[in-house]
Amino acid sequence: PLRVKYPNQTIYISYREILEYTLSHSDNNTCDWLIDFVGGIKHVDSYIKSLGITYLNLTETEHSMHEDIMRSYNNWSTPLSVARLLQKIFTEHILTNEHFIFLEEAMLKCSSGKDKLIAGLPADIKFGHKTGHSDRTSDGIRICEADAGVIYLPNGEKCYIAVLIKDSRESDQNNVQIMADIAALVYHSLKKGLTD
């Protein structure tokens, strides 16, 4: 999205705007800029693991995965690890209050993935999330379709959810419908629990 807005130009933008493009608009270029800024992908991987999130591996950037799609397999996680990372961010004060508010607002303003998890939730339910997906291999396999976020329940509680679809031969429409269906089932179960 940033390259579309500023084609073939030298630009100067704030880190705040770079973060907004990365979080709210899923911009791969700004994601890689941020990775470089904090010391590289190995540093990001080490930091997340230092938080106690162990079932993940990050060795590739967006650029390296676009150069060779098979490198996408080097980056992996479990849905539980992604959801636990979100839970830690929201409950353990990993970020300063100012940075947490910024992150939460950026996730609530996410413009991508309107047909993913959020599509399975009632329109009046707040949902902050971050989406992603890989390219397809030459065999038509979508290595990853992802959405992870926070459902704000009517009673004030939060539900942390992550859905990662791996090696799918399904159409993009079917993949996102699976995600929406999962979100609907989770919300229905949570709502039932609130009324029992």
Q: Model-found features: residue ranges?
A:
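Active-site-proximal loop and beta-strand segments within enzyme catalytic domains
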Residues: 1-16
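Structured, acidic catalytic/metal-binding patches in enzyme active sites
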Residues: 10, 25-26
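Structured C-terminal helix/loop/strand segments within mature extracytoplasmic catalytic/sensor domains
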Residues: 36-37, 41, 84-116, 120-125, ...
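Mid-domain, small-residue-enriched loop/turn segments at the edges of structured enzyme/sensor domains
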Residues: 11, 19, 32-94
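Secretory-pathway/luminal and periplasmic proteins that interact with or process carbohydrate-rich
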Residues: 1-4, 28-31, 55-59, 112-117
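Catalytic-loop motifs flanking and including active-site residues across diverse enzymes
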Residues: 18, 26, 30, 78-81, ...
